Amino acid sequence: MAPNLRKSHPLLKMINNSLIDLPTPSNISAWWNFGSLLGICLMTQILTGLLLAMHYTADTTLAFSSVAHTCRNVQYGWLIRNLHANGASFFFICIYLHIGRGFYYGSYLYKETWNTGIILLLTLMATAFVGYVLPWGQMSFWGATVITNLFSAIPYIGQTLVEWAWGGFSVDNPTLTRFFALHFLLPFAIAGLTLIHLTFLHESGSNNPLGIVSNCDKIPFHPYFTLKDILGFALMVLPLTSLALFSPNLLGDPENFTPANPLVTPPHIKPEWYFLFAYAILRSIPNKLGGVLALAASVLVLFLSPFLHKAKQRTMTFRPLSQLLFWILVTNLFILTWVGSQPVEHPFIIIGQLASITYFTILLILFPIIGTLENKMLNF
């Protein structure tokens, strides 16, 4: 009998073991679809980004008009730009849901997979930030100024670090040029990290909604989950194209339709919606260094999840108290996102401070306590 090329060819063998004959738990739900959706997001962003880069000029005098030119004069340039800008939003929606899934079902106990995932999140955040600066509108310029300025809070080396990042004494042409270089490079770094993420995942195999070992009941990835993933793609592409075609500027800031002007500060400087929760935590501390540390901690706290897991059960499927706490955390993140978009005045300041305290309290204190309590309840 002739050997099966899919199983014998050195390259096809890798693809086969990762995407075709991969043993997969039979009971994973739609929450396990977001990994493949993130892959599609990444490919879409790289493709549209490449097409945009062909028409973009990384120069302060030309950047804004080159983007306008792309939208006006390039064949379907408006569509490519709208898909790229809104694709970023969908990327973040998918990654937040993916992390939420991992948190709910205890997937963080696969430490290597979880840690590479957090590094992926940080890289994605960096990519989105430098990308937002490229159109060189008002919010691009002032967002870059405010966020890069945060590094000056680092003791002793802060100011030097900021001027080194800027390539001068303010955000100017060198800053834009290097941000374009970084925005081009980082998505490929994300693609490389994704392969590492998947390598670690395939070492252990997928988790499942019950959180129990599922070796006795696994099915091949293809055709079952390839088909399921295609349904997922369709359900994501539909709202993405609808948003890009019907209301492409819904999630953007009107301030960015004005070319960057260092002499005029916008009344409310705020990042894109997907950074608002972290921005609210940053603003809730009246001290610069304290705010920067809280901002960093808001994401880096995820690294501690595996060590704060005290429950005997892996997932929250049969842990109602932890479930309640989880959904309070989700609501709290929505409150932080909303507060981050509001001006710094009463009552938003105190709401932001309370929500920030709640965020860290739930993650660092309440989850371990409730987990231990539920262990005790198992004995009754």
UniProtKB/Swiss-Prot annotation:
Entry's cofactor comment: Binds 2 heme b groups non-covalently.
GO molecular function: metal ion binding; ubiquinol-cytochrome-c reductase activity
Residues binding heme b b566: H98, H197
UniProt keyword annotations, A-Z: Electron transport, Heme, Iron, Membrane, Metal-binding, Mitochondrion, Mitochondrion inner membrane, Respiratory chain, Transmembrane, Transmembrane helix, Transport, Ubiquinone
Cofactor annotation: heme b
GO biological process terms on file: mitochondrial electron transport, ubiquinol to cytochrome c
Membrane topology: Multi-pass membrane protein
InterPro entries: Cyt_b/b6_C, Cyt_b/b6_C_sf, Cyt_b/b6_N, Cytb/b6-like_sf, Cytochrome_b, Cytochrome_b_C_euk/bac, Cytochrome_b_N_euk/bac, Di-haem_cyt_TM
Binding site for heme b b562: H84, H183
Gene Ontology CC: mitochondrial inner membrane; respiratory chain complex III
PROSITE patterns noted in UniProt: CYTB_CTER (PS51003), CYTB_NTER (PS51002)
Protein residues bound to a ubiquinone: H202
Matches recorded under SUPFAM superfamilies: a domain/subunit of cytochrome bc1 complex (Ubiquinol-cytochrome c reductase), Transmembrane di-heme cytochromes
One Pfam family per UniProt: Cytochrom_B_C
Main location: mitochondrion
Cellular localization per UniProt: Mitochondrion inner membrane
Assembly notes: The cytochrome bc1 complex contains 11 subunits: 3 respiratory subunits (MT-CYB, CYC1 and UQCRFS1), 2 core proteins (UQCRC1 and UQCRC2) and 6 low-molecular weight proteins (UQCRH/QCR6, UQCRB/QCR7, UQCRQ/QCR8, UQCR10/QCR9, UQCR11/QCR10 and a cleavage product of UQCRFS1). This cytochrome bc1 complex then forms a dimer.
Function of the protein: Component of the ubiquinol-cytochrome c reductase complex (complex III or cytochrome b-c1 complex) that is part of the mitochondrial respiratory chain. The b-c1 complex mediates electron transfer from ubiquinol to cytochrome c. Contributes to the generation of a proton gradient across the mitochondrial membrane that is then used for ATP synthesis.
Annotated family: Belongs to the cytochrome b family.
Miscellaneous comment: Heme 1 (or BL or b562) is low-potential and absorbs at about 562 nm, and heme 2 (or BH or b566) is high-potential and absorbs at about 566 nm.
Protein name per its UniProtKB record: Cytochrome b
Organism: Macronectes giganteus
